[in-house]
């Protein structure tokens, strides 16, 4: 009788161990990306320098070089920003006035002929630099996060609750190329 009970308990213990392992792996994966959403990667976006994705939906803010008809950068407004509304069949849509002036808009100031200082209207503590790089003769955006200079490709903003005017932003992750190692990195900033 004891042997039979032991065999049943042994099988139960094995099943429980496997279940605990599976659940803990899922929790670990969720802690790396706690958002339940799957974010698409923007592709073939003309003159895009970086993009922002954030909770609570998959719509993506695109930041692209604003070229004039003559092919030169518009020095008074070097970045044009807009939505790719993936939740609405990938429709391109300009930011609303409120989004442009209080949330996702970018302010710029020329610092020299091919370089601009940028900052988000909603978070002025993160200075960005837009400059043309000699190696590819294209514009790129750079930022310093955690003592690392990063050529920005994407920013993810984790939002947990709050309101329209005051979202509860937990952190932002900047992904791009580390200027010193030339490797892809992601750095998190607590906000």
Task: Label every PLM stretch briefly.
Residues 1-34:
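Bacterial Sec-dependent N-terminal signal peptides
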Residues 66-68, 118-122, 176:
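Short beta-strand element of the conserved SAM-dependent methyltransferase core
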Residues 127-170, 177-178:
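Acidic, glycine-rich flexible loop segments
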Residues 175-191:
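Short, low-complexity, Pro/Ser/Thr/Gly-rich segments in the mature regions of secreted, periplasmic
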Residues 89-137:
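Predominantly extracellular/secreted and cell-surface proteins with exposed
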Residues 47-50, 60-69, 106-108, 128-133, ...:
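Broad, structure-driven detector of short, well-ordered beta-strand segments within folded domains
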Residues 29-95, 184:
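N-terminal export/targeting and maturation segments
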